[in-house]
Amino acid sequence: MSQAPIELKGSSFTLSVVHLHNSQPEVIRPALIAKVGQAPAFLKNAPVVINITDVNGSVEWHEMLRMFSAAGLHVIGVSGCRDETQKQAVLHAGLPLLSEGKGAVKKAPVAPATPVAAKTKIISTPVRSGQQIYARSGDLIVTSHVSAGAELIADGNIHVYGIMRGRALAGAAGDSGSQIFCSHLSAELVSIAGQYWLSDQIPENYYGQAAHLTLSSGALTIQSLF
């Protein structure tokens, strides 16, 4: 039997969400250019979602898309619409409406599943620029250096015992209890359960030092590892 020409499967991706607090082009345009300039290796040509929860009034979506495209960002959808007018404007611009997972539908109770031990992925070689390492359903341990432009992703914790220059995204499946441990933090980006800092947001006195990152009340916190 020949294979079907297409196959539809469920999957999940880690995406950056741009929260708009203003919809004026003259305000948004320079802010986008400045933000992409802070981490061009991570943000240039990156897919993003626009959240408009804090936007009052209408958005000129065609102009907004041109600005994002000019800054090197690809808008794949919009979240945070508060009324039908906003939703229709987004759809009219040809953009999908996305949900960020709040207010999930309740499911019927089921018998508890037998716990499965989380797997830990251990990488003992350098992680080069352009490489992506993903530890699904577990922790990720890297005993060597991580180059700029490399990406570490784990559903659990991330441990880096070399110099961390790339991107570290812990709690990728949404676990806010995940943590990041670095013996030398020089990262382009650190993220736990979707909350992230770019390099310029990492407190200066911890940059280049041994550091431990966690989430507290929904915000990233950092302290010395030793």
UniProtKB/Swiss-Prot annotation:
Highest taxon in the source lineage: Bacteria
Cross-referenced InterPro entries: CAP/MinC_C (IPR016098), MinC (IPR013033), MinC_C_sf (IPR036145), MinC_N (IPR007874), Septum_form_inhib_MinC_C (IPR005526)
Coiled coil: none
Organism lineage: Bacteria, Pseudomonadati, Pseudomonadota, Gammaproteobacteria, Enterobacterales
Species the sequence originates in: Edwardsiella ictaluri (strain 93-146)
GO terms classed as biological process: cell morphogenesis; division septum assembly; regulation of cell division; regulation of cell septum assembly
This protein's UniProt keywords: Cell cycle, Cell division, Septation
Family label: Belongs to the MinC family.
Pfam (any one): MinC_C
Protein name: Probable septum site-determining protein MinC
